């Protein structure tokens, strides 16, 4: 299931009273045609201060690490924790062709971005499925490295030179980024030493810290940040609405079933990173109709255990859910550590790994497309734990280890 990472908490200051919350009613539009043009992602050609340039709005129901509010011609996005322990960052997303607000009061120090953006540099493969789902893959102009990418469409664009690699040596080529002048460079939710110089050079660095969310749906809802930047709010509402509906329907079906005991994870560098009870992994297991001995622990991150401690509590778990790219057979599992054979799930052949789709460079689609599609992950888990609830299920990410 991967190694869950902890989340901290930085609180957002109250935004100016002139802003409308995302759940507020839509303001009357003095110019429907102009507002419609804005909703379709085109620049405003005749600004009217009485027009609401966001007739299609987004609300956040699961994501907690960013907020989104509206004024008539701009949005304010605040990422509460752009990287672990960092202070909140605020972005003013101004509709192209309209005036930016004064950077005073609560907006002092905010980064102003003209939207919809036309060029994006992406630091994480998790962004790729979002822009694909939103139909704006043509706006992707840079990726950190193609090595971990699964998407054949993106790889073809890299091969053709349409998309450039800007950190292929694991360090950001600041001169290349500055020379390209992308509208936005979206981070991977961690700070990099290159971001300071890039900001000083005028590059708009926008944080995407979806991995700090504690629920799978919360992570997926960051598609709405991408939509706010690209002017594809209606599409994001449609896409996420379907994901949310399918997820909750599956969870409701699994809730009625008898819980199955699960062993999540595997050894990594001599430690077993066991997801805590408040983590997104724990939420997925519970929603799939499963349980595990550490489900009652607090915290959204993980705890490190030795294998003996895991055996003591989880030896008899019926299903083992791992995430190891190299495992294809039970023999591969045993070769990793002979002690794995002591688990009941190994003896019965119920060992699964989220490694069905691996890219040419070793990138795992579970970490690329899966972050934005928790409905597909949950579907795999339900079919694994309760196959009677999902006859004929086509697995997206998980596969069973063969004998």
Regions found by a protein language model. Give the residues of each.
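A short, structured surface patch at a secondary-structure boundary
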Residues: 75-178, 185-189
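Bacterial Sec-type N-terminal signal peptides, specifically the leucine/valine-rich hydrophobic h-region
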Residues: 17-20
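Flexible, glycine-rich surface segments
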Residues: 252-253, 257-337
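Sec-dependent N-terminal signal peptides
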Residues: 5-15
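Extracytoplasmic ligand-binding site segments that recognize negatively charged/polar headgroups
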Residues: 118, 123, 127-130, 143-153, ...
């Amino acid at each position: 299931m991967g190694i869950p990472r902890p989340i901290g908490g930085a609180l957002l200051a109250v935004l100016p009273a002139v802003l409308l919350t995302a759940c507020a009613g839509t303001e009357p539009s003095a110019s429907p045609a102009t507002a419609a043009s804005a909703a379709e992602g085109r620049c405003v050609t005749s600004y009217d201060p009485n027009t609401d340039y966001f007739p299609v709005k987004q609300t956040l129901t699961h994501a907690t690490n960013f907020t989104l509010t509206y004024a008539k011609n701009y949005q304010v996005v605040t990422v509460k924790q752009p990287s672990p322990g960092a202070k909140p960052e605020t972005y003013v997303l101004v509709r192209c062709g309209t005036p930016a607000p004064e950077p005073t009061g609560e907006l002092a120090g905010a980064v102003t971005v003209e939207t919809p953006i036309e060029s994006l540099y992406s630091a994480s493969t998790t962004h790729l499925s979002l822009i694909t789902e939103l139909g704006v893959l043509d706006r992707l102009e840079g990726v950190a490295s193609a090595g971990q990418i699964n998407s054949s469409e993106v790889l073809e664009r890299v091969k053709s030179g349409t998309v450039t690699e800007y950190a292929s040596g694991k360090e950001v080529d600041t001169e290349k980024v500055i020379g390209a002048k992308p509208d936005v460079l979206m981070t991977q939710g961690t700070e990099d030493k290159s971001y300071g110089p890039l900001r000083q050079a005028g590059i708009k660095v926008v944080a995407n810290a979806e991995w700090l969310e504690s629920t799978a749906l919360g992570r997926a809802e960051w598609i709405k940040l991408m939509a706010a930047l690209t002017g594809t709010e209606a599409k994001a509402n449609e896409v996420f609405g379907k994901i949310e509906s399918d997820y909750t329907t599956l969870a409701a079906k699994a809730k009625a079933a008898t819980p199955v005991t699960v062993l999540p994870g595997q050894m990594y560098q001599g430690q077993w990173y066991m997801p805590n009870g408040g983590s997104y992994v724990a939420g997925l297991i519970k929603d799939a109709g499963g349980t595990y001995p550490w489900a009652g622990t607090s915290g959204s991150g993980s705890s490190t255990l030795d294998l003996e401690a895991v055996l003591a509590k989880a030896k008899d778990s019926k299903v083992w859910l791992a995430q190891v790219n190299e495992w294809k057979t039970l023999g591969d599992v045993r070769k990793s550590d002979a002690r794995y054979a002591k688990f009941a799930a190994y003896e019965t052949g119920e060992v699964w790994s989220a490694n069905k789709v691996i890219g040419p460079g070793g990138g795992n689609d579970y970490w690329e497309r899966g972050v934005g599609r928790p409905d597909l992950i949950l579907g795999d888990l339900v079919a694994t734990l309760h196959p009677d609830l999902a006859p004929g299920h086509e697995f997206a990410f998980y596969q069973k280890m063969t004998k």
